[in-house]
From Swiss-Prot:
One of its GO terms (cellular component) is cytoplasm. This is Leucyl/phenylalanyl-tRNA--protein transferase. InterPro entries: Acyl_CoA_acyltransferase, Leu/Phe-tRNA_Trfase, Leu/Phe-tRNA_Trfase_C, Leu/Phe-tRNA_Trfase_N. It comes from the Bacteria. Keywords: Acyltransferase, Cytoplasm, Transferase. It holds the Pfam family Leu_Phe_trans. It comes from Xanthomonas axonopodis pv. citri (strain 306). It is an enzyme of class 2 (transferase). Functions in the N-end rule pathway of protein degradation where it conjugates Leu, Phe and, less efficiently, Met from aminoacyl-tRNAs to the N-termini of proteins containing an N-terminal arginine or lysine.
Length: 249
């Protein structure tokens, strides 16, 4: 018999999640409710293809939609026009030098069709804690000293789970996404999780992956050796113009 209610999580952050395959069909992917955003629970969730997503006036909701949106890190779609703009860009890209500013901007930058944000203060503090533990990372795009775009997410093993991105200037988020995809591809990470389908992600080359296949990939990739600690030294500072020559679709 199909379930019509999500699982209720208890207060123990080490308690296991129910299998993601048991998520509801309506609303698509809702698996569990409650618990907290402790680092142990978040890492356990992501390692099993589950992520939190809820509004300020809701309890913590945990999701694993079917299908799942992913980017193959060698197949980000960049238009010829955008590549030409990149080749003449003076912007630079860094990693893990402005994580808190990126997550704050993702929470506060206005978005078409959205009223308010799901990146609550509680969510921000949870991901900042993961960042301080070396599990959450950001790619940041600068125009001089001004932050004009960025993306952040969670890394476990060799799997990156994207959370949100922003633009304070046209193209900023696209540059951040391209920089992240290129970095992951260079390191041999094949997938970037994009969570939930939307037209913008599809236009950039995101693909629908059946949840069962996604979970198989997650299980494989999270078991592989990670990049420990901060990425700032490993990544350094790179010109955004180099992305115009990147071998992405």
């Amino acid at each position: 018999m199909a379930r019509h209610l999500p699982f209720l999580l208890d207060a123990d952050p080490t308690a296991p999640f129910p299998p993601a395959a048991q998520a509801l069909r309506d609303p698509d992917g809702l698996l569990a409710i409650g618990g907290d955003l402790a680092p142990q629970r978040l890492l356990n969730a992501y390692a099993h293809g589950i992520f939190p997503w809820f509004s300020q006036d809701q309890p913590i909701l945990w999701w694993s939609p079917d299908p799942r949106m992913v980017f193959r890190t060698d197949a980000l779609r960049l238009s010829s026009r955008f590549r030409r703009q990149l080749r003449s860009s003076s912007w630079t890209v860094r990693a893990d030098t402005a994580f808190e500013q990126v997550i704050d901007a993702c929470a506060s930058v206005p978005r078409a069709g959205q009223d308010g944000t799901w990146i609550t203060a509680q969510m921000q503090q949870a991901y900042i804690a993961l960042h301080e533990l070396g599990h959450a990372h950001s790619l940041e795009v600068f125009d001089g000293t001004r932050l004009v775009g960025g993306i952040y997410g969670v890394a476990i093993g060799q799997m990156f789970f994207g959370e949100s991105m922003f633009s304070a200037q046209s193209g900023g988020s696209k540059v951040a996404l391209a920089a992240l995809a290129m970095h992951l591809h260079t390191e041999g990470w094949p997938l970037l999780d994009a969570q939930v389908e939307n037209p913008h992600l599809l236009s950039l080359g995101a693909q629908r992956l059946p949840r069962a296949q996604f979970l198989q990939q997650v299980q494989l990739q999270v078991a592989r050796p990670a990049l420990p600690g901060t990425w700032s030294g490993r990544y350094g500072q790179r010109p955004a113009s180099s992305l115009g020559e990147a071998r992405l679709t």
